[in-house]
Structures are given as structure tokens and as C-alpha cells.
Regions:
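Eukaryote-biased recognition of intrinsically disordered, low-complexity regulatory segments
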Residues: 2-22
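Short strand-turn-strand beta-turns centered on an Asx-Gly dipeptide
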Residues: 10, 64-67
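Short, contiguous acidic and Ser/Thr-rich linear segments
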Residues: 19-31
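Ferredoxin-type iron-sulfur electron-transfer modules in oxidoreductases and energy-metabolism complexes
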Residues: 30-42, 89-259
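Active-site phosphate-binding and catalytic loops of NTP-dependent enzymes
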Residues: 44-50
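DNA-contacting interfaces and partner/effector-binding or oligomerization modules
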Residues: 50, 60-64
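A generic structural motif
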Residues: 76-77
């Protein structure tokens, strides 16, 4: 038999809700998701929890545990002090559907706004060799499991509620991956500045801190994009050189997510 743990779980829907107290058994080696499953099985059969792989790879079980955005399947009970109460609440940035399940469809709409990868048609299959630095950079960005913890913790979305103006850190690294690809020909910098709100990010690195895949979102993704925007639109020397040499990429404005 394990020890009893004080578990506070947010119960409710979009209209109203509150924290409900439970005493749940916890065994050695378990994670918070194990306790939620035990709670469903023994005390709260109607508790709504989104989960899938229980291996930290699907991003489904995102929630806030003691106020910090985490994956429930990767948060071990051993990280808490003995007797410490555990509070589990839904992601605060997104609308609640029921209990711990939130509506993250905002992110899907944002993804549809991004112009897709546009390869150079003049380069045939197998004619270009990727450099290792480009491979490594892309591999880091592609580790994203779309848990949206970074979107949840971003204060531009969470506190200032700038969902219409700022695309969020998850999609800033998606844009960085496209913009830094050596074969991509689309010019998204104006859209990154005007439509996706790169200027709103003040690089507090809170998104990097909560990423379960340890992607260096701020330093390797957002800051390089912001630097490219500055070089393009605010550096007079770079502007002069571009005027002499001409642009290599075709402008790619943001897309209509409802189209």
C-alpha cells in the first residue's frame, strides 16, 4: 500500500468550476497521471482528463500542476515533498471544456496561417547536400510534441491575451525552422513582423523553461527571427545592400485560416 496524498483537482466547465479535495493513494515511481487515473477509477469516474501515450511524446496530458505548466505523465511524485498537497488545474491560457480538458483549437488556426515550405524548383532531387549544422538546427525544432505548454506560459497570450496579435512561441520555432531551411524560397519576414507579432515577445525565456523536449525556443528560434526582422526592416545598411543585390525570396503573406 502506498501513502495517501492530498490532491486538489479543478472540476467544472466553461461556465463555472472549483477545486475539489481528494485523498489518493500514491505508490513509489508513479507520476501525477497515475494518480488521476486512480482517482477516476475509485472516486471520480466522470473526471475529464486528456491523455494518450503516457510516455511524454504525444503532448496530450498538458495541465498545470502546483501552478506550473507540465505534462502529467512526466511529473513524478518524487518531485514533491512528503505531505505536500498537489493542485492540478487546466491550462489557464485556453478555454476550459470540462475539468482538466481545454480547447486548444486556437493553435490549429494559427498553424493554418503559416505559409508552407516552398522548395527551390530549380534544384532537382538529390542535387543539394544539407550541411550538418542545418540538420542539427532542424532536428531541435522538430522535437516539438505540440503540448502547448509554451503557449500556456507565454505571458503575451496568458496575461495580455494578445491571441490575435501574437502567434506564440510554438509557432515562432515552426517559422524559424522554415526560415532557416537552406532550400526554402518563401519570404515570411514581413508576415512574422506584421501578422505573427514577433515584436511582442520580450524574451523572458519562460517558454524555454517549461518545454519538456528541452528545445531552446528563445535563443535558437525566437531571437534569430527577431534579428532577421530587424536586419530586414530597420538596418539601413542591410537595406541598401539588398537594394543593390536584389531579393532572393518571394514574399509569403500570412494565410487565411478559414480558407
Amino acid at each position: 500500500m502506498g501513502e495517501k496524498v492530498a490532491l486538489q483537482v479543478w472540476r467544472g466547465d466553461a461556465g463555472q468550476g472549483r477545486l475539489t479535495d481528494y485523498q489518493v493513494e500514491a505508490n513509489e515511481g508513479e507520476v501525477v497521471l497515475d494518480l488521476l487515473h486512480r482517482l477516476q477509477a475509485t472516486q471520480a469516474g466522470d473526471l475529464a482528463v486528456r491523455w494518450n501515450c503516457k510516455a511524454g511524446k504525444c503532448g496530450s496530458c498538458s495541465m498545470e500542476i502546483n501552478g506550473r505548466p507540465r505534462l502529467a505523465c512526466m511529473t513524478r511524485m518524487s518531485t514533491f515533498e512528503p505531505g505536500e498537497p498537489i493542485t492540478v488545474t487546466p491550462l489557464r491560457t485556453f478555454p476550459v471544456i470540462r475539468d482538466l480538458v481545454t480547447d486548444v483549437s486556437f493553435n490549429y488556426a494559427k498553424a493554418r496561417q503559416i505559409p508552407s515550405f516552398t522548395p527551390d524548383p530549380s534544384i532537382g532531387l538529390g542535387e543539394f547536400r544539407m550541411q550538418q549544422v542545418d540538420v542539427q538546427r532542424s532536428q531541435e525544432f522538430r522535437k516539438c510534441i505540440e503540448c502547448y505548454l509554451c503557449q500556456d506560459v507565454c505571458h503575451i497570450l496568458r496575461d495580455q491575451q494578445k491571441q490575435d496579435e501574437f502567434i506564440g512561441p510554438r509557432f515562432m520555432i515552426f517559422l524559424a525552422n522554415l526560415d532557416m531551411h537552406p532550400l526554402d524560397t518563401a519570404d515570411r519576414l514581413r508576415a512574422i513582423r506584421d501578422d505573427f507579432g514577433s515584436g511582442y515577445c520580450n524574451i523572458t525565456k519562460c517558454c524555454t523553461d517549461v518545454c519538456p523536449e528541452h528545445i531552446n525556443i528563445t535563443d535558437n528560434g525566437i531571437i534569430p527571427l527577431k534579428e532577421r526582422v530587424v536586419d530586414r526592416f530597420y538596418d539601413p545598411i542591410a537595406r541598401l545592400l539588398r537594394g543593390i543585390g536584389g531579393g532572393k525570396k518571394e514574399p509569403a503573406p500570412a494565410l487565411d485560416p478559414d480558407a
